[in-house]
Amino acid sequence: MAVSASTFRGFDPAAIEFMADLAANNDRAWFQPRKAEYERLIRDPFEALVAELADRLETRGIPLHADPKRSIFRIYRDTRFSRDKSPYKTHLGASFPWMEPGERGYEVVDGSAHGNGGYFNFQPGEMYVGGGMWMPDKGRLEAFRRAIVEDPDRVRAALEEPGFVAAFGSVTAHETYKRLPPDVPADHPMADLMRYKDVVFGRRLADDEVTSPRLPDTLADAFAAGMPVLRFLATIRA
């Protein structure tokens, strides 16, 4: 039976152990007899967490979309084009896309995995909360570079906002280009940003934060701190 939206009490430490065991036994023969345990320990509390987070975001006016049925990624891997045929992910994540005012109230701008928004990762040894613009298409990446060239003060103001720096330090990238764009001098003060293939930020979460019933507030606090960068990235258009 699914946990109701009002009953998130923190993840059971056994949920962390389950994911560690899954990483060591990533096959259907191990998982299928334990599927009900996965649902009880991880899936159902995850849905309850996202439901409570949705309430926190709305109350605090943080324009990120949290939906218990849509925000959480599936545990099953798509192995069709991968040499790794392991059937299950060894982490579980949830994304919370950026919203803007529309004709019917706030609406999701880009609900794809490559849009601007927040993210929560549940994985033994890799618990974290963060956000940004993950691996955007070429047009948005070029728009980001134009913003750096045309209005560096606006970019700097977002990246150096004290609350953001206190929570996350700085933005980073999963991957970078080896070379700068040909029209950017090597001594440009934001040359490092020009090499970014995406723009992300995050902070690690301790296990006792993840097992706490205050986790929805912890995530909402993190997303609030990330607003200067998320708002800036929301203005980036191809």
What are these regions (language model features)?
Residues 59-88, 92, 167-181:
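A short, surface-exposed loop/turn module that caps and links secondary-structure elements
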Residues 2-21, 50, 54-57, 79, ...:
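Long, solvent-exposed, polar/charged low-complexity segments
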